[in-house]
Amino acid sequence: ISCSLVGSEMCIRDRLRGGKFGHVGHMESGMISTGETVSLKVDEAARRDTEKNHSATHLLQKALKTVLGSHVEQKGSLVTPDRLRFDFAHFQAMTADEIAQVEALVNKEIQAGLEVRTDVMDVEEAKKSGAMALFGEKYDQKVRVVSMGDFSKEFCGGTHVDNTNNLG
């Protein structure tokens, strides 16, 4: 999101803290005073690229669990318009064969053109449906669940593509 006043520019980034989304901004030039009217716009290209990378992390997590085992646990991630990083716990380094299997599975699900669906439901209903939640995370009574066909189902508040074939 960016904000422009004559002679001023502000950059605003979405942040997730404590399970809540917020917007954090900093002035790149100029000043904004209390009571001024500002105009905000979303950087659509950056948003589309970010949602692609964010959706890909869901496929990657499921592929890692499928290839390496259900013990794989997400420890962190970074999603930006130009890249993604997925940190996870596993008891040993991945072999070249395991990496190739994960890559092939992610590519298969991208090419399968899975519908990406979002539902809001009671947290207990979501858990019973098989949606994956982050261990130790606290959730509200109502949660957002993102499903990618029958392949991946997770608690998630992020932005996503409508279909996995939009990732290719």
What role is predicted for each listed range?
Residues 2-4, 8-168:
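A glycine- and charged-residue-rich anion-binding loop/surface
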